[in-house]
């Protein structure tokens, strides 16, 4: 199983809820890169998108559920998640939105860019800093809509297998296991959390987040051991 898929993508829907849905373009890849379409009154916002055949029809379907046929914009929430944001934005004639404080991203996007802080356009989603550090290099923004209880965490949390130790169903990223973003994420008690690797948690997400943060350090070496074993065994 490759870390990242290549070639023709095979879009698989995840995370359908009243207000959006997600997709994984390469379901068989280890990283399980997840993207999301958030339907708002301002149109559909695409979060950290990976392109795939059938994506535009998928976006239209998500928009139809909310009574909109417009793509409002594309947003990059992690400095490493430029993915296919520029190509998709150009195709739909919209800007790529990049947090104002995030460095080294806007100049690498071959598309019009809008820098933003606070609310993402008129989406109802408020942006906030999850992590902005040089060691490890990490610039991550979260999104939260208090009206729908939807939280987007693009990297610090995930459900892909390499995020999970023991019986965890939502885990902290391996690189952050010893320094989890507990102070930031524990402020939220969302109904659902959408993540950038794997399917999200669509109910009682606040409890799942608290459990993940609480077990982060305790389960760190179990996760590292599992990862090392998988690497050795292939």
What are the residue ranges of the model-derived segments?
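Active-site metal-binding motif and surrounding structural segment of the metallo-beta-lactamase
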Residues: 50-101
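Generic beta-sheet signal
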Residues: 77, 97-100, 116, 153-154, ...
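Short, hydrophobic/aromatic-rich segments at coil-to-beta transitions
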Residues: 18-25, 73, 122-128
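Structured loop/turn residues at beta-strand edges in well-structured enzyme cores
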Residues: 69, 123, 188
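Metallo-beta-lactamase
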Residues: 2-15, 21-22, 27-30, 43-46, 94-139, 146-148, 172-173, 177-180, ...
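Short glycine-/acidic-enriched loop or helix-start segments at secondary-structure transitions
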Residues: 56-57, 84-86, 108, 162-163, ...
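Residue-level detector of beta-strand structural context in well-folded domains
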Residues: 12, 34-36, 116-118, 141
